[in-house]
Amino acid sequence: MKQNLLLSLVAFLLCGALIVQAQEPAKSVAGPTTTAAGAAVISITANSTPLDLARAAFTAQGGEKFRNVRNMMLRGSVDLYQPNSVQSIPGGFSIVTAGDKLRMDIDARPIVVFKQIYDGQQSYSSLPNVELPPITKFGLSLLIKFDQPGYKVTAIPDKKRQRGFRIADAEGNTTDFYIDATTGRVMSFLIYYAGYTFGTDMKKFKEIDGVLVPSSFSQRFEMPQGAFFADYNVKEVKLNQTLPEDAFAIPN
């Protein structure tokens, strides 16, 4: 695989981490909460405002339990599709997050074996020239902060049976969310980073300790030479574990 295409693929794979919520210290403002994703009461009507939709999505994810996840570990398989190819490249992945810290490992030999670590201050990549999108500023991590000062929730067009809303922070980092009009679950989202658009579609979910976690999802990354696709299947989920001290250690 050509180097530029490989780097694009790796950058795309890093966005798989955006389905994992990464928590920064923050306090929520007054609003409905829930004790478990399965017990959440979701009310979405034709008159629901963008803020109502964001609150419904937050509640469906598990409410305050979703917000207060200390760390999350996902492991599973991934099938990669290069632009203009119907042949998949099978591999495995592991994602660990805690706050704004991240460790992601991808093994899709012989095409790519990759490790990315961010320890909260500095980052490490096993491949040069790969930039990590800040996971606390996009995706489900942004949904956690929908009601925080400095975050703006606005309307976007709905699509099919899904209601849409946009969350942006003070720096302009933006994610567009589309939620099920009945359950409030986030079914897809789009992020905009470094001039590119990354799309994620949720297929299946698991409820773990009152938190809704995607167990199967796909991603799409548009490039001038075509689109990358990746299908992820999560086989193991762990929340709020005691992590080893070197979980996010930067290699010497």
Mark where each language-model region is.
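Bacterial N-terminal signal peptides that target proteins for export
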Residues: M1-L9
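Bacterial N-terminal signal peptides
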Residues: S8-A17
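Boundary at the C-terminal end of the N-terminal hydrophobic targeting segment
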Residues: V20-A22
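N-terminal propeptides/low-complexity segments immediately following signal peptides
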Residues: E24-A36
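N-terminal mature ectodomain segment of secretory-pathway/periplasmic proteins
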Residues: G38-A46, P50-N129
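Acidic/charged, solvent-exposed loop-and-adjacent secondary-structure segments enriched in E/D, K/R, S/T
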Residues: G120-Q148
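A short, amphipathic edge element
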Residues: I144-I156, A194-T200
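Gly/Pro-enriched, hydrophobic low-complexity segments
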Residues: R161-P251
